[in-house]
């Protein structure tokens, strides 16, 4: 999964340097149970180190910010865009696509409303304006960015079926329940991909390169 992060950074660099590339979007899954650490997280709890030593999790650092994210059973997206929108506006454009796409599948999402504070250990332990929560108040999608030279990389994790036991071991909190959709992750990704292409004119995205390889 270190290669995934390198590929995402390479996509950002290509978006910056190549005038033909406006935006890239990739979807992928993680093999095994991985915990990604936000770029600005300085320390990790001792019990995480113990879980790593015991082989219960793997740990990698993301180039994007935010708190720690457990990648297991969900969907990751990585989007790069060659625009210098204000950060809030860039999150809003992406989230509007996600809200519309999941509404079409029967899942209603809304913006988080927690105030920004110091980085919380668990990304999914708080819901900011950059995040999306479901109708029952569970955070379903957490997103974070890296901004560089007039472009940005946005990572997002869509929690569809997180492992409850491992989640509690890591965060000492209950995991969100399995998402109430009778679809596989592959089917969700296909819908997101099609929805993005269909509505790109409404969200100011064009010249899109999409790769949903796992």
Q: Regions from the language model: what does each represent?
A:
Residues 31, 72, 134-137, 148-149, ...:
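Short acidic-glycine loop/turn motifs at beta-strand connectors
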Residues 73-129:
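Internal, conserved structured core segments that host functional sites
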Residues 96-118, 146-214:
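Long, positively charged amphipathic alpha-helical accessory segments at protein N-termini or as interdomain linkers
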Residues 1-50, 54, 58-62, 133, ...:
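Active-site loop/lid in soluble adenylation, ligation, and acyl-transfer enzymes
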């Amino acid at each position: 999964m270190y290669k995934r992060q390198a590929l995402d950074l390479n996509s950002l660099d290509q978006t910056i340097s190549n005038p033909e590339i406006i935006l890239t979007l990739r979807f992928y899954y993680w093999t095994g149970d991985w915990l990604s650490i936000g770029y600005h997280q300085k320390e990790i709890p001792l019990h995480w180190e113990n879980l790593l030593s015991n082989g219960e999790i793997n740990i990698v650092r993301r180039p994007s910010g935010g708190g720690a994210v457990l990648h297991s059973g969900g969907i990751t997206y990585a989007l790069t865009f060659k625009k210098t929108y204000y950060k809030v506006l860039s999150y809003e454009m992406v989230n509007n696509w996600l809200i519309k796409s999941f509404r079409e599948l029967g899942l209603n999402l809304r913006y988080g409303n927690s105030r920004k504070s110091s980085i919380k250990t668990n990304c999914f332990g708080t819901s900011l304006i950059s995040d999306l929560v479901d109708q029952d108040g569970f955070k379903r999608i957490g997103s974070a960015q890296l901004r560089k030279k007039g472009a940005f990389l946005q990572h997002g994790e869509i929690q569809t079926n997180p492992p409850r036991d491992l989640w509690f071991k890591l965060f000492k909190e209950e995991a969100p329940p399995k998402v109430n959709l009778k679809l596989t992750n592959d089917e969700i990704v296909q819908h997101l991909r099609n929805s993005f292409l269909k509505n790109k004119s409404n969200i100011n995205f064009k010249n899109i390169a999409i790769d949903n390889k796992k």
